[in-house]
C-alpha cells in the first residue's frame, strides 16, 4: 500500500527493558545476531523488537531524516505474523523477525520507490526486487524506505529531492552517500539491518562515515533485478549492519542465482557467517602503496595502519603490493558510470510512469520539460557527461579507453590476489 513520506505515527509502549526492570541496552541497540538468539530463545518477541525500533524512528527522525517512507502498521503486522509462526514451532531463519530498512532505489511491491527523485515521487512498483523476495522468504520485517542521493548519484545524501540526511554522531556532518539513509538508520538505531546499493562506494563510504559495517558484494553474487539502474556494469545491492557477523548474515540471505538477471552467477554460496570465525593467523594482507600517497587524510591513514598492525599482531603477514592503474580508477569510473547512466535514465520520459510536465506543445517538448523539471542538477550533469562521452567522435577517446582501464585494474587486482588473502585499503 502507498505510503507518503511521514514520521512514525504513534508512540511505542514501554521498552522491553523497562518492563523487566533492567538497565541494559534497549532492543533497538542490539545486533541482529544477538536479537536472533533472543528471539529463538523467546527472551523477547519480534513485535517488541519492532516496537522498539519504531519508537527510535519516531524520536530520532526529526533530527536524522533517514526515512522517506515508514511502514509502521505493515511492520507490526509482519512481526506479529512471525511471532505466531515461532509460537507454533515452525522452522524459521536467523533473520526472521529482524527489522530491516530498504534503500529507496530497490523496488518494493505496493510501497513507493522514489529513488529520492521528483520524477519518481509517486511511483509504486507492481513487483518486488529479487532481494525483497529473499528477505520476505527469510521472515525479515520491512520497516520502510530510506533516503539517498537522487538515483544514487552523490556521496553525501544531500542530493535527495525530499530532504537531507544527517550523520547520527554529529548532525552538522553528512552521513556519506549515496546510501546515507541506510547507514544513518543503522548508526542511529532506526534499523537493525539495512540494504543499500554501491556503484562507486555508495555503501562503503557512508558506512565508514557512520561507524558501521557495509559490504559491496562481488558483482553477480546478488541479483540486480528490481534495483533501479544507475550504471549496470557497476551497480550492486549490499548489506549494512552494526557488525561483520550481522552483515554476513544479511549477505547470506540475499545472494544467489536469479534467472531474471543475466549477470547473476550460477554457483553455490556458503553461509558467510561461518567465515567470520576464520583465523587471522596465516593471512597474507596486501598493503598497496598507491592508496597511502598524497591526498589521504593523516587521521584516515593512521586509522587504516592501526588496523593493519592489529591484524599483524594477530598473526597475519603484511605484504607490500603495487596497483599502478589505481591512479586512473576515478576518471574511468566517472566516464563509465555517466555513460551507462545516460542510457539507463533515458527511460524516464513521462510516457509510461513517473512525473510528467504540465505544460508542453508537442511530444518532444513533453520529454524535454519532464526531464528538466523531474531530474535534479547532479543527475542532469551526469546524463549530459554520459551523452557527451558516448557521442560520435568521443566514444573511442573516452568510453573505450575507460573500459580498457577498467580491465587493467581488474587484472592487477586478480594478479595480486594470486598470492594474497586480502588487500587492506
Language-model segment annotations:
Residues 95-115, 274-286, 339-410:
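Short helix-loop capping/hinge segments that flank enzyme active sites or metal/cofactor-binding pockets
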Residues 53, 75, 247, 285, ...:
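Residue-level signal for inorganic ion chemistry
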Residues 423-425:
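Conserved small/polar residues in nucleotide/adenosyl-binding loops
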Residues 127-257:
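Short glycine/serine-rich loop segments
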Residues 3, 11-13, 18-77, 300, ...:
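An N-terminal boundary/leader segment
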